[in-house]
């Protein structure tokens, strides 16, 4: 098989992303594949500005921030055992996983 697998993890909670990345790296290393990462990608911040009042007081505003955290993991010289281990892996529901082969 011996192909490169790229895994991108994305979440709004950095603890979930780090724990999931650590779990994936441990699983892949146990199967004997070579792992590069987890590589932290830039944090994407979305800032929302909202008026506090509905009618007057335009100067009074409130800001909310939504940060998304990303990690990148590359797996080299993977085998069928590596792919099976990744398929059986349980990850938290707050983490988006994107896999490219």
Swiss-Prot record:
- Biological process per Gene Ontology, one example term: translation
* Alphabetized GO MF terms: structural constituent of ribosome; tRNA binding
- State the GO CC annotations: ribonucleoprotein complex; ribosome
Coiled-coil segments on the chain, per record: none
UniProt key word NAD: no
Q: Which UniProt keywords apply?
A: Ribonucleoprotein, Ribosomal protein
Q: Which InterPro entries match?
A: Ribosomal_uS10, Ribosomal_uS10_CS, Ribosomal_uS10_dom, Ribosomal_uS10_dom_sf
Top-rank taxon: Bacteria
Stated family: Belongs to the universal ribosomal protein uS10 family.
Q: Which NCBIfam families match?
A: PRK00596.1, rpsJ_bact
Say what the protein does.
Involved in the binding of tRNA to the ribosomes.
Self-association state and partner proteins as the record states: Part of the 30S ribosomal subunit.
The protein here is known as: Small ribosomal subunit protein uS10
Task: Please tell me the species this chain comes from.
Answer: Phocaeicola vulgatus (strain ATCC 8482 / DSM 1447 / JCM 5826 / CCUG 4940 / NBRC 14291 / NCTC 11154)
Gene designation per UniProt: rpsJ
């Amino acid at each position: 098989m011996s192909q490169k697998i790229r895994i991108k993890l994305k979440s709004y909670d950095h603890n979930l992303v780090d724990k999931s990345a650590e779990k994936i790296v441990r699983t892949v290393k146990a199967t004997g594949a070579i792992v590069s990462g987890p590589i932290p990608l830039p944090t994407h911040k979305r800032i929302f500005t909202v008026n506090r009042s509905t009618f007057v007081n335009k100067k009074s505003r409130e800001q909310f921030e939504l940060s998304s955290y990303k990690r990148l993991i590359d797996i080299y010289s993977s085998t069928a055992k590596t792919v099976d281990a990744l398929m059986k892996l349980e990850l938290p529901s707050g983490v988006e996983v994107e896999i490219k082969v």
